[in-house]
A protein has these predicted regions:
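Alpha-helical transmembrane segments
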Residues: 35-38, 63, 128-131
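Short alpha-helix boundary/capping motifs
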Residues: 40, 56, 60-61, 104-106
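Membrane-embedded catalytic cores of phosphoryl/pyrophosphoryl-handling enzymes
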Residues: 45, 93-131
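Interfacial segments of alpha-helical transmembrane regions
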Residues: 45-73
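Short alpha-helical linear motifs
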Residues: 52-54, 68-69, 83-89, 115-116
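N-terminal transmembrane-helix/juxtamembrane module of multi-pass inner/ER membrane proteins
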Residues: 1-40, 74-101
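Membrane-helix interface segments
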Residues: 24, 54-59, 125-131
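Membrane-water interface at transmembrane helix exits
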Residues: 49, 73, 77-82, 121, ...
């Protein structure tokens, strides 16, 4: 099963590299990607939510969710699965950015975004805080 997933990934990533990747778009993609590094964007937004009383609970829930997500993803699951990053496993794939973390799955970027979004959605009531 993992071989099938790897083959599909390789095909899609090489197609994107050859068909979609444009030199003028690379800086935008790199910037967008770095926003998610270390959950920085979500941490900054969560800290900002702590500054206003109506959104304080949302900010605290978000920071807690980010911490739990980090522990589950980066400390527990990634070391167990140890799926290599595509640019180390796919021959001919040229990365725009590289990472110090050799494991690609599960995605820390996705975990952080999901954790923050889930916390925001779960703590904002219809009459209460709005984000």
């Amino acid at each position: 099963m993992l071989e099938v997933i790897q083959t599909v990934d390789e095909t899609i990533l090489l197609w994107i590299q050859e068909t979609v990747r444009q030199g003028w778009l690379n800086p935008l993609v790199e910037f967008y990607t770095t926003l998610g590094n270390g959950g920085l964007l979500w941490i900054v937004l969560s800290l900002a939510l702590l500054c206003w009383r109506p959104t304080r609970r949302v900010g605290a829930a978000s920071l807690l969710a980010l911490a739990i997500g980090f522990l589950c993803t980066n400390v527990a699951v990634k070391p167990l699965i140890q799926r290599p990053r595509p640019y180390t496993a796919v021959e001919g794939l040229i990365p725009l950015l590289t990472s110090g973390d050799p494991n690609s799955f599960p995605s820390g970027h996705t975990c952080a975004a999901f954790a923050a979004g889930l916390a925001w959605g779960g703590t904002c009531s219809a009459r209460g805080a709005r984000v």
